[in-house]
Regions:
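Alpha-helical scaffold domains
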Residues: 1-270
Length: 270
């Protein structure tokens, strides 16, 4: 839809270095049907900021070109096209546009309600949450209520969105018990993943596989949240993990994540 803005920004190394390209694609691990151009986050942020300020010419299905005067109009166009027709980078930029425009909280949440269901990749989800600085400024009770339906979803990245957003916004002393209680209520076996689980490392990038228990990206999201909580509230986090109903594999991922982080590598995880 806006790929004509993006093609010139693809780095030459991604185009010409097969090993580098394979590494980039392996890190993102997009589903096979999601095309990846090869942009990095700084370039996507730059495009989103430019579109937010000045709008863009978008190409709709049927080669129809439409001049959008604002970032909000571009978002509306994203909402109207089949999400599977978008490049990975376009899905990231869509979320960045929701974050960087000047909107009311109600407008953002309306846009976000359309955006979260198209998340199909950890990087799309996490890039959005990491840049949603507006979430830190809204009423916490209001935002917490908004997240609850996503926690209850049966779709992997809708649940991961709720987890990562909670990690970014609610790991505070007065909210910690609420976050832990919500995490402990997750029914991992009821969450559906589009990724296949395999026992060995995928032979090539973008095969739609993960080498762990499904839904891997929800389990890893919980592990990441807990490792972050450990850095801030070590005793309360250990107490929660020891008394929780979390699956053993999630606890193992949490311990591994804690050991890998420079903030918690010397902190007892359990």
């Amino acid at each position: 839809m806006i790929e004509h803005y993006l093609y010139p920004l693809v780095c030459e190394r991604f185009k010409n270095d097969a090993r580098y390209r394979e590494g980039h694609l392996r890190v993102i691990n997009a589903l096979p049907e999601r095309k990846v151009l090869g942009l990095h986050t700084p370039e996507m942020k730059r495009v989103a900021k430019e579109i937010s300020l000045n709008g863009a010419a978008v190409k709709l299905p049927g080669d129809k070109e439409f001049a959008c005067c604002s970032g909000q109009e571009v978002i509306r166009c994203f909402e109207q096209v089949p999400s599977e027709s978008l490049f990975y980078e376009e899905t990231v930029i869509w979320g960045l546009l929701v974050n960087c425009g000047k909107y009311t909280v109600d407008e953002r949440l309306e846009m976000l309600s359309c955006y979260v269901p198209i998340m199909d990749n950890w990087a799309v989800c996490d890039t959005y949450c990491a840049n949603a600085k507006w979430m830190l400024k809204v009423d916490k009770e209001f935002l917490w209520r908004f997240l609850q339906p996503w926690f209850e979803s049966h779709r992997e990245f809708e649940v991961r969105f709720a987890i990562v957003a909670s990690m970014c916004c609610f790991l505070q002393e007065e909210w910690l018990d609420s976050v832990f209680e919500r995490i402990d209520m997750l029914s991992f076996n009821d969450i559906v993943s589009e990724y296949r689980t395999i026992n060995s490392k995928p032979l090539k990038a973008q095969e739609g596989c993960v080498q762990d228990v499904s839904p891997y990206y929800v389990r890893m999201g919980v592990a990441w949240l807990l490792a972050t909580a450990l850095a801030k509230f070590p005793e309360r986090t250990r107490l929660f993990v020891r008394s929780s109903r979390l699956p053993a594999d999630v606890v193992r991922l949490y311990v591994r994540k804690a050991r890998e982080s420079f903030r918690t590598r010397t902190v007892t995880a359990l």
